[in-house]
A protein has these predicted regions:
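Low-complexity, acidic/polar, glycine-enriched regions of mature
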Residues: 1-180
Length: 180
């Protein structure tokens, strides 16, 4: 990674965090693949001379999640649908909590790195892995997948289980690294 050593603060002021869901089941065509933006999140990247001296911590506020789009489905998502999805996430699935991450190791080389660490969702901690890419010009991108059931989270289902949110969700963060 070409980011100079230092401590960097990331969040909505210089980046975007997205959660992307898919759907499955016999009624899957009725639902939507969602893109959810996390409005309140923060991360600190401590960058050393080499990857072994680097660390990453982050936190995301579940209550700040907003559905920004939904692909597929029988009908387009209305603003009311989006509000109901948020209410379900906060009230029935995750609670109005924080999601936390703390790296345990960072490896790789060039413009790519693998960040491994402990992810805590709904009070349960499990290992997680994210791919970090230096996009150039001070831009970075982190991607990873989270299996909800690894954290005791039951993916949403409707129509007696005929429509389900896939257990695996995609996480994507893109940010501009501020000056150290």
């Amino acid at each position: 990674m070409a980011i100079p050593p230092g401590s960097y603060k990331l969040g909505p002021e210089n980046g975007k965090m997205l959660v992307k869901t898919g759907r499955e089941g016999m009624g899957g065509k009725m639902g939507h693949d969602l893109v959810i933006e996390v409005g309140r999140w923060s991360a600190t990247a401590d960058v050393g001379e080499d990857l072994s001296a680097c660390s990453l911590t982050g936190s995301a506020d579940v209550g700040s999640m907003e559905v920004v789009s939904g692909e597929g489905g029988v009908k387009p998502l209305s603003d009311g649908d989006k509000a109901e999805i948020k209410k379900t996430i906060v009230d029935k699935i995750l609670g109005d909590t924080k999601i936390d991450f703390k790296s345990t190791s960072i490896s790789g080389g060039g413009s790519n790195a693998t960040v491994q660490g402990d992810l805590t969702i709904a009070g349960k901690t499990a290992p997680a892995q994210f791919q970090l890419q230096d996009l150039g010009g001070g831009r970075i991108k982190a991607t990873g997948q989270v299996v909800q059931s690894n954290f005791g989270v039951k993916p949403f289902k409707a129509f007696m289980g005929a429509l389900k949110v896939k257990d695996t969700v995609d996480i994507e963060i893109e940010a501009t690294v501020p000056e150290a």
